[in-house]
């Protein structure tokens, strides 16, 4: 099938959150499975620093009375065509923000639709989050191009209302409306990034005022679990960590622990449990819970803590102040750095992710891949990816708690600290976590079923596709 991915983020070229990881990795697996997959994204001002882009465009067009040009390159280290939407509106070195954000992404979406109509015509356009939400609306009347719309985070629906009401070209049913709601209504199929989140967003607690629409259209909604790029996130070959290792050589992992302690200014202590957090420092990620229990946990245990990320200023300030109270035991790095995050996964003993809500979450998958045991609140994709640790039956992959309460989070962390002292059992837990299959292969098969369905084919994999997916999965393991 011919599939065009359209998104505001594509890792490793432009990434703010998990959507970039998905759009940067899922096309690779679909390509391996024999599909003609291409990617369409804005030509941000920093893209030319990362890949070679020809000076001459492959196509020029017009959208919203503006001229634009499309340049072709390739996703790094692949043969997957990458189309870059060029216009001065995207020349800055930022992805999001600014008063013109709604206009920029409406223009980008319109340009992607024009490109699909007039240059490279796919069978399916796979749209990602609100930035591309107008594409299903415009494509709804197109008989030979279907759309799939993926909700990565329902909380971010786009600053659209005032803008759309001023656009005379906007369809009548969009006047004063929510563009994500329109995408949900007009896409041929809607997906989200985990089965549990697909159920949760049909309830008032998680539906962000769209639960009625999502519940009404639940037959058109499917949750497909995200995966990670297991070639990039591979502790046996990762050039960004101090010492490579795998599930059968965990004795080498302690060198990464010592290295991350040195790098972040912690005391060198291989016996202290190192807790890692790599996250946006916002309420969604449970940072308020962390702040409430941190003094008590650090006083009760001899653990160390590394926090990596940026976010709300008041959280950054509080965490920075708390770090000063625990010199040598707590490090706060207020930045986004993929290489450093991998060193945290490779060196920390546990990974704390107490999210208020979590559509899927990728950090816990990356952590497990590196033998870093997750402590999670059971919500969204965290339910689908982390199972309760049972040392008696030697089952499970992490520590979980249900209620969004400080005491519950504290208790789970103390249980992990106590379990960490039993080294033989802990190593078995690490091996189970590292060997869990969070590659894209099975999930890619579920997307293929969705793609077949929207073009009128039976939603099932052929024996050849089943065999290929099984072969790729076996090679990963």
From Swiss-Prot:
The keyword Glycosyltransferase applies. One of its GO terms (biological process) is glycogen biosynthetic process. Its EC number is 2.4.1.21. ADP-alpha-D-glucose binds at residue 15. Gene3D superfamilies: Glycogen Phosphorylase B. One of its GO terms (molecular function) is alpha-1,4-glucan glucosyltransferase (ADP-glucose donor) activity. It is an enzyme of class 2 (transferase). Keywords: Glycogen biosynthesis, Glycosyltransferase, Transferase. InterPro entries: Glyco_trans_1, GS/SS, Starch_synth_cat_dom. Pathway: Glycan biosynthesis; glycogen biosynthesis. It catalyses: [(1->4)-alpha-D-glucosyl](n) + ADP-alpha-D-glucose = [(1->4)-alpha-D-glucosyl](n+1) + ADP + H(+). The keyword Repeat does not apply. NCBIfam families: glgA, PRK00654.1-3. Synthesizes alpha-1,4-glucan chains using ADP-glucose. Belongs to the glycosyltransferase 1 family. Bacterial/plant glycogen synthase subfamily. This is Glycogen synthase 1. It comes from Synechocystis sp. (strain ATCC 27184 / PCC 6803 / Kazusa). The gene is glgA1.
């Amino acid at each position: 099938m011919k599939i065009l991915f359209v998104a505001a983020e594509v890792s490793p070229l432009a990434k703010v959150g998990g959507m970039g990881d998905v759009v940067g990795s899922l096309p690779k697996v679909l390509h391996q499975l024999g599909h003609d997959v291409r990617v369409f994204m804005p030509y941000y001002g920093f893209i030319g620093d990362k890949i070679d882009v020809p000076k001459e465009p492959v196509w020029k067009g017009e959208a919203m009375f503006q001229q634009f040009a499309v340049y072709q390159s390739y996703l790094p280290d692949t043969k997957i065509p990458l189309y870059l939407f060029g216009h001065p509106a995207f020349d800055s070195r930022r992805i999001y923000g600014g008063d013109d954000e709604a206009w920029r992404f409406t223009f980008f979406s319109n340009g992607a639709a024009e490109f699909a109509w007039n240059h490279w015509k796919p069978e399916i356009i796979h749209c990602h989050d609100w930035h591309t939400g107008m594409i299903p609306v415009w494509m709804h009347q197109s008989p030979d191009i279907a759309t799939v719309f993926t909700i990565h985070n329902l909380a971010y629906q786009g600053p659209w209302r005032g803008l759309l009401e001023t656009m005379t070209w906007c369809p009548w049913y969009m006047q004063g409306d929510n563009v994500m709601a329109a995408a949900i209504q007009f896409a041929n199929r809607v997906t989200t990034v985990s089965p549990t989140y697909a159920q949760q967003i049909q309830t008032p607690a998680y539906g962000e005022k769209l639960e009625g629409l999502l519940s009404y259209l639940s037959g058109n909604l499917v949750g497909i679990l995200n995966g990670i790029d297991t070639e990039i996130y591979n502790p046996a070959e990762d050039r960004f960590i101090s010492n490579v290792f795998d599930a059968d050589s965990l004795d080498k992992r302690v060198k990464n622990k010592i290295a991350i302690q040195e790098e972040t200014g912690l005391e060198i202590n291989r016996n202290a449990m190192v807790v890692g957090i790599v996250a946006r420092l916002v309420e969604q990620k449970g940072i308020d819970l962390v702040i409430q229990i941190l003094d008590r946990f650090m006083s009760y245990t001899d653990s160390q803590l590394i926090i990596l990320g940026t976010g709300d200023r008041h959280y950054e300030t509080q965490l920075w102040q708390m770090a000063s109270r625990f010199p040598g035991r707590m490090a706060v790095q207020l930045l986004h750095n993929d290489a450093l995050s991998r060193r945290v996964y490779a060196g920390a003993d546990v990974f704390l992710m107490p999210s208020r809500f979590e559509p899927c979450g990728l950090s816990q998958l990356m952590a497990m891949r590196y033998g870093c045991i997750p402590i999670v609140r059971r919500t969204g994709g965290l339910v689908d990816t982390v199972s309760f640790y049972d040392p008696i039956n030697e089952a499970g992959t992490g520590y979980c708690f249900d209620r969004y309460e400080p005491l519950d989070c504290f208790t789970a962390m103390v249980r992990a600290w106590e379990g960490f002292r039993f080294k033989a059992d802990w190593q078995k837990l690490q091996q189970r976590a590292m060997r869990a299959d969070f590659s894209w292969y099975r999930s890619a098969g579920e997307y293929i079923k969705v793609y077949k369905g929207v073009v009128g084919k039976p939603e099932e994999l052929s024996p050849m596709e089943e065999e290929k997916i099984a072969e790729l999965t076996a090679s990963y393991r």
